[in-house]
Design a protein with these regions (language model features):
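Flexible, low-complexity junctional segments that flank or bridge functional domains
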Residues: 2-10, 19-221
Length: 221
């Protein structure tokens, strides 16, 4: 009997050499996939859609494309803290064309979505750090919702502002209850938020490619 590998093993085998190369070169984030990444995308699709290789081959139909798109957004913004409904609506053409993108290795839309994500992270972090200039108002009882997986995307920037205001207030309160002084809290949170932005800014093209390909392989596995 011929062995049929799970989707994630096939993808890992094909992308590992690319990851090692990216670590060695450390390129800046590109606007599109490299030629090698495009080829890998086509190879992974060919293997995962062929019953000779995949344990459970699955076609890239409309339902699967929607699942890939959903998983990719969850990878980037699982807490729905950065994208707005307007952002997600603008990504609709990408969702509709995911099958074509993967089959043809034309992954520019995935990089475009990430570019928007990177911008939104910068905006949100800037807003959060600005809030630290003043101690939150603890005279009102408010609830911060940790698990936001099933909530809708924020309707607009104003909703995100409110979400982040509560998030910063919650972060501040936790440190305050731990006995930290206002200046200590401000310094700690400022570093925390700056580190978040820095970690996103340091992501490379290979990381974006892996995020998207993982969304695909997990959707069909």
């Amino acid at each position: 009997m011929k062995f049929k590998a799970p989707a994630f093993l096939i993808a890992l085998a094909l992308t590992a050499p690319l990851a090692l190369s990216a670590q060695a070169d450390g390129p800046a984030l590109p606007a599109a996939a490299t030629a090698d990444q495009a080829t890998t995308s086509k190879l992974v699709y060919g293997l995962l859609s062929d019953s000779r290789y995949a344990y459970r081959p699955r076609a890239l139909d409309e339902a699967t494309s929607k699942d890939v798109f959903k998983r990719y957004l969850e990878t980037l913004d699982g807490g729905k803290q950065f994208f707005t409904q307007a952002d997600v609506a603008k990504f609709a053409p990408f969702e509709a064309g995911i099958a074509t993108a993967i089959r043809g290795g034309e992954l520019e839309p995935a990089f475009q979505v990430f570019s928007v994500y990177k911008q939104r992270v910068g905006q949100r972090v800037g807003y959060a750090r600005n809030l630290l200039k003043r101690e939150p108002d603890f005279s009102t009882d408010e609830r911060f919702e940790y698990d936001r997986k099933d909530v809708p995307w924020a309707a607009n920037d104003a909703e995100l502002d409110e979400l982040w205001r509560k998030s910063v207030k919650n972060d501040w309160l936790r440190l305050k209850l731990a006995g930290k002084k206002p200046d200590e809290i401000r310094t700690t949170l400022d570093k925390r938020y700056a580190t978040l932005e820095k970690s996103v800014n340091e992501l490379k093209g290979e990381d974006v490619f892996q995020f998207f390909l993982n969304a695909y392989t997990s959707a069909v596995d």
